[in-house]
């Protein structure tokens, strides 16, 4: 190093001192070289080229000047023809010489000089090394023919009257017009102009042909009839239109030859132009063209972005979107990258839709296509994912990119996005409204297990209907069900409302009860003016404010309602079976609702968390007064309200102290420490103090911690909830959370078994290992052994989730084939099992629990067709599986996103009802079942008052189950067995026939294969009967009778029992005969106050948040959580 340093000479002192003062600037200035760029554009030629060609605005001006110059030359030619007076005679000299005045000649010479100079200049600027390419161009040749003779006449005066075919400048004007339009489109940045250009070219070609023909014939007939311009125009029009009257005809052979030549040119040129125009028109029809900017600025439109458009999706969107009166004038622009299929094209040609729906083929990722759709002027943009894709994650990624592209192009356009998988939701948090399909689906299926038909309830609420479905039906339940299906959620400010204005300063429950009693509306929630959070049933301690926004359920919104007082209504004498608007209550309802006599304190005490108790007063009080209901207080009395603190689990009061102690040691309440994906809403749940080892989560495999290998061995106190899914996706987490929410009583927690086709990953197991009684098993519903091991014989509900791998099929609606057949097998094998099925296509609901010869199902099918013909959005609602809540399709919830355009609160309310979101002070959805002890309440109005006065619950509907009045054809068919009843008397014979009818299900076929084989065996035994005697013959006869009486259901039951015995499972408790085939269930949303309460009715309730009444609710939530892994564990959350 010393040698190297010694080789570098030291700097002189002056440089060192200067560097100290000035730094390195001196050295940099000495080494700098000034470089000028784009020197090639500074030449004279390049400057001219920039002005005449490259610059868009200056080039456009040059083109416009050139076009005007050509038109002027044609105009001067017409003036010359009109001014001349040709001498009489037929000399050929009239063809070559014309009369041209001096001023006209001067103008034509000037125009020719300018045109020739401009043409030569542009040829020089566009010269690329081949001079002949510039000279032999047709525009250049025409310019030479029309300009050079005039320039020569300047130097040779005798040639001033020489004929020059100046009318050919029309073709140069056409060429200049095309260039001008191209420059104009470049200047205004318009690229989608092919159709306009082609139409312009066609029109200009026609005009040039006609103008050339007119001028040519007029000039050539100077030696003949001497036609004027008007006669020439008349002849050309008649000739080109193929009419040919013959009153004006050319006489000279030259003019005739010219006409033939022009017709030949027209036959060659025009078909080419028409062919190009037709091709562009067809392409335009495929791509959809452009949405007019003028219309976008003067009219309102929304854009629907989809990857592929199916007819079902289109009709769902159009029917729901245009169901609202204020949206009738909106246009819908569909932006889709694929071509329209035949069905969509046919629908969009219907006048009702063709005037309001515009289909554009394009991609949301292209700014040009977004510009075509005028996305920046749109009122909203709906972006839908394609759910019928094998790779749903890829479909979500496309949706995310579309949302990003729209937000980048039009940041002020409201976004309504549908996403499939919950782990992708956080990518589009910026969207105004987001519906995650799997979140809603699993939460809805979970609530179906504890609140029956929740999926049907939500589906009816988010569909727009007038409640006119089923009103033409002869059956009363269909009229009631159809009328109540028209109820929707609406909102209004309290001080502006006729329904709720009088309840300012009063409690929420008081307002809800009296509004329902007086107007028939169900107040379900409120929102403060200065708060964005919606509170469902905030409870009796919430005081209504004048600026509160009230959310209520009704047939129509208040603004569209008319009000009549009681006297007017009595005079009208209109008998209504349903209450909508003010109605006269029955006498017993009015007396009961007065609340003049209060019931005892124990009747207003807190219910058990398992459900409200509509118990009668005590025996002592019955002797004094009849049952009555306490009034709903205007302002809650703190001393009289006993809150249902579910944190202490009052539902467990019936348990022994030892059981209660063990239960408290086993469970805790808190927020789940792990979430399988980012963006899941934290929910207060029942949790374990310590997470379960992964090996213990496997239901059918023993481990070192337990030795159980089937569901029966665990000895669960409550029935199972089984979920059959293909994979343990992140959305399945939302199935578990609502069933383990903190407000669910511990005694009523059902064990959850996940029957998965594929093993779950570790992240999912990390999330579910903290929840009590959650297990999984690898198996399939195709395998009977797997079903028996997971405990299907004593399960309360079986949820069959649609498989992603079967969601797409080549034939429409065939995606559900495997699911439908598997569920039908379950339905046959386990008739007592409540099966809840998810389908891809709602149209396939008619195949659920299919019975080919069921007359009642056939009648419902006809009713569905009639409702569809009437234009109903809910034609499928009368299908018994849907009405009972046993089938669901996620596509039914697409209307939730569409309805949010008008009701921006619908997604929030639905998430609160399903338990996907929890807001402090907001209630939750639950249900209670009416028993025989509760029938004293009699009417829905009294039930409403009882719940509001006791615990603050708000009922919103009834799930009713009735016996099926119309028996099926199969249940009426029975085969007489009298010919085999030789050994029995008539009483036993009738007894056996009755048993046979009862044991035969309504869905079996007339002659099942198994029973046919059994009968054949019995006949063979009967033929061999004479060979036996005594007890042997009697035994054979008895076997023969028993075999015949066995129904298909009994055959299947025996098959199941044999498999259970083979697997070592106990057959105790297997009930093969208890089914629900002879009943029908349906929902009554917000029924009238005088609706009778019936036995086994299930009432939907919105129960107040029990934590809202605790003094320190938030600390209690946080402190009650078990000691689990801290924030570091969240870093392992799967993205």
From Swiss-Prot:
Intramembrane stretches: 229-249
Topological domain spans for side Cytoplasmic: 1-63, 123-137, 186-198, 278-1135
Record-annotated membrane-spanning stretches: 64-84, 102-122, 138-158, 165-185, 199-219, 257-277
Keywords: Cell membrane, Disease variant, Epilepsy, Glycoprotein, Ion channel, Ion transport, Membrane, Phosphoprotein, Potassium, Potassium channel, Potassium transport, Transmembrane, Transmembrane helix, Transport
Regulation: Are normally in a closed state unless activated by an increase in intracellular Na(+) and Cl(-). Inhibited upon stimulation of G-protein coupled receptors, such as CHRM1 and GRM1. There is conflicting data about the effect of ATP on KNCT2 channels activity. Intracellular ATP was initially report to inhibit the channel activity. However, others studies conclude that KNCT2 channels are not inhibited by intracellular ATP.
GO biological process, one term: potassium ion transmembrane transport
Topological domains, Extracellular: 85-101, 159-164, 220-228, 250-256
PTM note: Phosphorylated by protein kinase C. Phosphorylation of the C-terminal domain inhibits channel activity.
Function, in words: Sodium-activated and chloride-activated potassium channel. Produces rapidly activating outward rectifier K(+) currents. Contributes to regulate neuronal excitability.
Name listed for the protein in its UniProt record: Potassium channel subfamily T member 2
Species annotation: Homo sapiens (Human)
Upper classification of the organism: Eukaryota, Metazoa, Chordata, Craniata, Vertebrata
